[in-house]
């Protein structure tokens, strides 16, 4: 904390004595700015000074006046996306210039370790195909990534570390694997530059990405205990409420973006009853503070992990699925089919390519309105009990399913609430589920345990979302 205060004082002294425009780190060489809109540019200068901003794409001079603390902000009109490299010159008497700027689409990634997970992987946790992805990364000249350093703060701050990097083998190992694969698909389809801001922290809870005044209302959160202001406790920051919001969200809210991508939830397992509403609150707050309307919010279902007997994370997945129903302009992709059996106790599954692609399909279909792209897999609709079997109907399965035999992931129970592995077979456009041990079915579940991967998808290979027909405790 003392080091942070000293650094802040030095920055203020430099600004006052040099009179040179100081920009936040997120405004840097190589950045991508959102196309065809008014983007915000901001920073510090001398107190009550006029700052001029001159982008090379229109050679127009925009002006802003700093306040008594030297803070200023301006809005600048951006052109249509292209691969032309631009510059922006800032001056309050002395000049600062940013170079190699692209105009395109900017997406903000956040969450915990599965969003943070870089192409280089974690210890004993590789990313599938990473070496090839890294080796060929320089071909993606239109992709730029800004990785925000972990920055837990007790109070909101104005700046955080993390500047834009071009895509190349030297830089790519540090890129979010999910974010980069999202960007690759988006760049291929839209053929315009894609910018990714990755502000994630492994192990973080949803409460960590909310401000103090909201978290203070939650009866299960003790701020004085959970924040722990004392110095020397940086290691636990990822589990603390509000700290990520203060240090990794608040400093970035002036940056104009197209939408949010979210991969989080593992650290909220066991708190499924509050998760959907708190995620909704977070999205509402972020949208309000960015001030860009109802920005799209697409998120990832937590992957199968842990015991095949328990269902704590299954309840969290159910809360995630329900969250998309109460969050406007949102959607969730499933990962139930993307985990190998040997990854049962690996909370960081290796397949990040399909996670990124599925997020891209959702953005391309819903946000960019590209017809013909499917983004949502089958969703449980209804159940009929007939002749000792459960006949299940689904939405988003009009073309049928991806397999005719060896259907896995289903369980069935009678009124005794004891679930048994079930036989599942196609029955026209339905799936027929039964078990010799359950003569009179009452409920069916699919993928509804901590680790219960399934293999059902529609003919676009988008997986069936885990579900249960019951509401038993």
Model-identified regions with their sequence ranges:
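Bacterial Sec-dependent N-terminal signal peptides
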Residues: 1-22
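Cell-envelope and extracellular/periplasmic
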Residues: 20-473
């Amino acid at each position: 904390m003392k080091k942070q205060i000293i650094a802040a004082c030095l920055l203020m002294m430099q600004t006052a004595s040099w009179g040179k425009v100081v920009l936040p780190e997120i405004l840097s060489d190589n950045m991508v700015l959102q196309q065809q809109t008014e983007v915000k540019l901001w920073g510090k200068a001398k107190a009550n000074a006029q700052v001029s901003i001159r982008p090379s794409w229109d050679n127009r001079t925009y002006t802003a006046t700093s306040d008594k603390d030297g803070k200023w902000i301006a809005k600048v009109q951006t052109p249509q996306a292209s691969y032309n490299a631009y510059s922006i010159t800032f001056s309050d008497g002395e000049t600062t210039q940013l170079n190699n700027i692209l105009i395109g689409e900017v997406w903000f990634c956040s969450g915990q370790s599965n969003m943070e997970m870089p192409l280089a992987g974690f210890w004993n946790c590789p990313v599938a195909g990473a070496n090839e992805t890294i080796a060929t990364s320089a071909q993606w000249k239109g992709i730029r990534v800004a990785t925000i350093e972990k920055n837990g703060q007790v109070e909101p701050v104005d700046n955080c570390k993390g500047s834009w990097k071009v895509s190349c083998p030297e830089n790519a190992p540090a890129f979010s694997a999910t974010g980069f694969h999202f960007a690759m698909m988006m760049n291929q389809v839209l053929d315009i530059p894609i910018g990714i801001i990755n502000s994630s922290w492994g192990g973080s809870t949803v409460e960590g990405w909310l401000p103090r005044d909201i978290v203070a209302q939650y009866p299960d959160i003790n701020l004085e205990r959970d924040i722990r202001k004392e110095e020397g406790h940086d290691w636990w920051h990822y589990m603390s409420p509000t700290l990520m919001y203060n240090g990794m969200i608040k400093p970035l809210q002036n940056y104009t973006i197209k939408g949010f991508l979210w991969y989080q939830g593992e650290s909220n397992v066991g708190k499924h009853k509050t998760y959907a509403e708190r995620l909704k609150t977070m999205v509402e707050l972020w949208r309000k503070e960015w001030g860009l309307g109802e920005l799209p919010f697409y998120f990832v279902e937590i992957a199968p992990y842990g015991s095949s007997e328990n269902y704590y994370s299954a309840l969290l997945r159910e809360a995630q699925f329900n969250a998309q129903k109460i969050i406007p302009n949102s959607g969730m992709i499933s990962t139930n089919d993307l985990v190998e059996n040997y990854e049962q106790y690996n909370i960081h599954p290796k397949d990040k390519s399909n996670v990124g692609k599925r997020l891209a399909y959702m953005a391309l279909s819903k946000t960019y309105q590209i017809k013909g792209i499917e983004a949502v897999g089958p969703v449980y609709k209804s159940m009929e009990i007939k002749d000792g079997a459960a006949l299940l109907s689904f939405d988003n399965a009009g073309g049928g399913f991806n397999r005719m035999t060896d259907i896995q992931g289903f369980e069935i129970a009678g009124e005794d609430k004891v679930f048994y592995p079930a036989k599942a077979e196609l029955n026209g456009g339905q799936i027929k589920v039964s078990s010799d041990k359950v003569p009179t079915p009452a409920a069916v579940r699919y993928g509804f345990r901590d680790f219960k991967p399934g293999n059902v998808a529609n003919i676009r290979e988008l997986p069936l979302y885990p579900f249960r027909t019951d509401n038993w405790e």
